[in-house]
From Swiss-Prot:
E.C. designation(s): 2.3.1.129
Origin organism lineage: Bacteria, Pseudomonadati, Pseudomonadota, Alphaproteobacteria, Hyphomicrobiales
Role of this protein: Involved in the biosynthesis of lipid A, a phosphorylated glycolipid that anchors the lipopolysaccharide to the outer membrane of the cell.
Xref: HAMAP family: LpxA
The protein's name in its UniProt record: Acyl-[acyl-carrier-protein]--UDP-N-acetylglucosamine O-acyltransferase
Length: 271
């Protein structure tokens, strides 16, 4: 049996399968289809022609536009029909034609999307991705499987992100770019193949980071990417100097972390 709150509004031309859980003030518009293992928390809106399927949970206040398909099976040759999950946070906006898939059993079985994210038309989040909070994915952005996008990153229209790549917090990936390697926090990546083109100074300023801090982060960036050694050696060498700068340390910790991908840099041959 479904659990449907009394204040929920479900159009007579919508299909809500037995077993679905529908919270207070949820709106399910005409021609929507909600699967039997779906949980829609309070004030979720499915406008029209929206499919929510699989073992999918959608947080409060999220709004989904027509032709989006959320919770579909992972597009992976390794998927054997196992039951996997998708968790979407609160107050996300999921525009027309967006697709977000569940995870795969071999990698924990879960795709996770945080809060306050904006997914513009026809963008795609593949299996096992981790998307943080306040992320903007512009039209036709494609995340391959196992991608991590950290908080407040912005991905420009039509860009593609290679599987297992990490996009750091408040990074910016330009439109039509190919992000084949990890992008540092506050980094700016452009082109195909993608090349690191400096820091996202505009984004840092909008986030309220003080100018003096931005200058220090720029100096750290130059030491890392313009020094004589490798990127990782250079990053290790300056850790003590920047120990009191949270933003610089965030970059250094990102570089030091284990990853399946190399690091994007101004010079792709160096890493």
């Amino acid at each position: 049996m479904s659990s449907i709150a009394k204040s929920a509004r479900i159009h007579k031309l919508a299909v809500v399968e037995d077993g679905a859980v529908i919270g207070e003030n949820v709106v399910v518009g005409p021609f929507c289809h909600v699967g039997p293992k779906v949980v829609l928390h309070d004030s979720v809106q499915l406008l029209t022609h929206v499919v929510v399927t699989g073992r999918t949970t959608i947080g409060k206040g999220t709004k989904i536009f027509p032709m989006a398909v959320v919770g579909g099976d992972p597009q992976s040759v390794h998927h054997g029909g196992e039951e996997t999950t998708l968790d979407i946070g609160e107050n996300c906006t999921i525009r027309e034609g967006v697709t977000i898939n569940t995870g795969t059993a071999d990698y924990g079985g879960k795709t996770v999307v945080g809060n306050n994210n904006l997914f513009l038309a026809n963008s795609h989040v593949a299996h096992d991705c981790r998307v943080g909070n306040n992320v903007i994915m512009s039209n036709n952005v494609m995340l391959a499987g196992h991608v991590t996008v950290e908080d407040r990153a912005i991905l420009g229209g039509g860009c593609a992100v290679h599987q297992f790549t990490r996009i750091g917090r408040q990074a910016f990936v330009g439109g039509l770019s190919a992000a084949s390697y990890d992008v540092i926090p506050y980094g700016m990546l452009n082109g195909n193949p993608g090349v690191l083109s400096g820091l996202n100074i505009v984004g840092m300023t909008r986030a309220g980071i003080e100018r003096s801090v931005i200058h220090r982060v720029r100096r750290a960036y130059k030491s890392i990417f313009e020094g004589e050694g490798s990127i990782r050696d250079n990053a290790t060498a300056i850790r003590e100097e920047y120990a009191d700068c949270k933003e610089a340390m965030e970059i250094l910790d990102f570089i030091a972390a284990d990853s399946d991908r190399a690091l994007s840099s101004p010079n792709r041959g160096k890493g």
